[in-house]
């Protein structure tokens, strides 16, 4: 799982190529891009460069992407690229976009990709409706950029939920304050509640500036066992 590149601000092509090289040594079956890979400061050439580079990750079953709250330039009136240009580039690079839809990977695994809750131009589906009819004997993984609605996912029968967004606080004392304000269901790390495995990554880069005083930058390798 890779999340929160915010490409062009805190990570450049050479650094991203090194990340791709390291991930390729892990021989992943599936690659999850969990949102905010680009943002309002990412130029059109940088956006194209980011996804083209990420498409070089070797995999068995594909690369899957969900939007974060920044990818579509939600916070600027003068974007460098449009949501249409973004989607076209991602698709051209062989990456599958999941936005409130389901992708069956094989006989054992299903991905449920969520629309970001901060996207005012997209009415987000109810997780129960979205997963209606899914075979509960299969293992299904929910991809949701922002760590939210975990209780609803658990009730619906989710096995794993993967999120980013928080940067684990990035700068002290944000990581201490945000859990107290209940801004997200989980700020960072791994928690198991009932049958639901919850994972929130700190992200592979920072937002706004290349500084961290909370947690480390990371990509996450997840080993999944059959039910």
Language model feature labels by segment:
Residues 1-227:
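Soluble catalytic domains of enzymes that build or remodel membrane lipids, polysaccharides, and related
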């Amino acid at each position: 799982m890779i999340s929160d590149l915010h490409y062009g601000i805190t990570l450049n092509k050479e650094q991203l190529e090194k990340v791709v090289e390291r991930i390729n040594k892990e021989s992943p079956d599936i690659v999850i891009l969990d949102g905010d890979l680009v943002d309002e400061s990412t130029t059109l050439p940088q956006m194209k460069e980011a996804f083209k580079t990420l498409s070089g990750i070797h995999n068995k079953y594909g690369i899957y992407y969900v939007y974060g709250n920044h990818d579509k330039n939600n916070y600027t009136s003068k974007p460098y690229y449009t949501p249409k240009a973004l989607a076209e580039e991602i698709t051209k690079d062989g990456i599958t976009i999941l936005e409130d839809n389901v992708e069956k990977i094989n006989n054992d695994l299903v991905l449920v990709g969520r629309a970001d809750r901060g996207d005012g131009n997209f009415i987000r589906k109810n997780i129960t409706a979205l997963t209606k009819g899914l075979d509960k004997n299969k293992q299904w993984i929910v991809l949701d950029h922002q760590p939210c609605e975990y209780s609803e996912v658990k009730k619906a029968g989710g096995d794993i939920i993967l999120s980013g967004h928080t940067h684990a606080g990035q700068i002290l004392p944000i990581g201490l304050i945000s859990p107290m304000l209940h801004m997200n269901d989980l700020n960072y790390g791994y928690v198991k509640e009932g049958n639901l495995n919850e994972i929130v990554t700190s992200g592979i880069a920072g937002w706004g500036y290349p500084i961290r005083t909370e947690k480390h930058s990371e990509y996450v390798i997840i080993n999944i066992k059959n039910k």
